[in-house]
Amino acid sequence: MCHNPETQEFFPELNLKTREICGENWTADRLAERLNSFRDVFELSGGGVTFSGGEPSCQADFLTELLPKLTDIHTILDTSGYCDAEKFLKLAAMFSKVYFDVKLVDDEEHRKYTGESNRIILDNLMALSERAIPFHVRIPLIPQITDTEDNLNRIGRILEKLPNRPESIDLLPYNELAGAKYETFGKRFQLHKGIRNDMDIIRRFKKTAEEKGYRVHMEGEKRVK
């Protein structure tokens, strides 16, 4: 769900077995106090805090208030990049690094599957790179949609135009277990059961990117440092 924020509602949803919503509202001060209390744990483990979602930039004002209150904690913004440019760059600069999703390069295809243009996303990616903010590009690989040879090659060409390269390209293969999550919320899962990624196409893209000097990590494979 984290890499598909456009599928999420902005308000709490009940799944089919839920009788009540148990979440609670937090102030920036209260959350900062809680996170800072784990600072020693983060330091020993080499960990930190990742803000994902949904889409964390939808809570940009809250995060802008929260981040300065965190003391010596490594932070990651995991985002679709769909955000007002000025607000996005101000927010991104406050994080240790950014995980930036790139799904589809063709604008018509992007509108078809997400309901929105990708113009602001690609513009934000370019602006992020221009400001030399540390970032990783993550590609959710949806069978026959984002994992096609044409789309992956287009993503490759977009990355080559960036003034500063991503620290890595992270390939996220499709996992059909997501279908069960849709069912719990009474939503129709539109992909056919049993559908799989074309791993030959993905491996060719990975090999080509590595030959061009990119560090590429495929989820499920051992990360090579």
Describe each region flagged by the PLM.
Residues 1-25:
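Canonical Radical SAM [4Fe-4S] cluster-binding loop centered on the CxxxCxxC motif
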Residues 17-21, 111-117, 186-194:
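Short glycine-enriched, charge-decorated loop/helix-capping segments at active-site entrances
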Residues 25, 149, 196-199:
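Electropositive phosphate-/nucleotide-binding environments in soluble metabolic enzymes
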Residues 32, 36-183:
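Conserved AdoMet/S-adenosylmethionine-binding subsite of the radical SAM
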Residues 97-98, 189-194, 217:
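A polyampholytic, Gly/Pro-enriched intrinsically disordered region
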Residues 150, 172, 178-181, 203-225:
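C-terminal accessory regions of radical SAM enzymes
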Residues 167, 183-208:
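A structural motif corresponding to the C-terminal lobe/cap of the Radical SAM core domain
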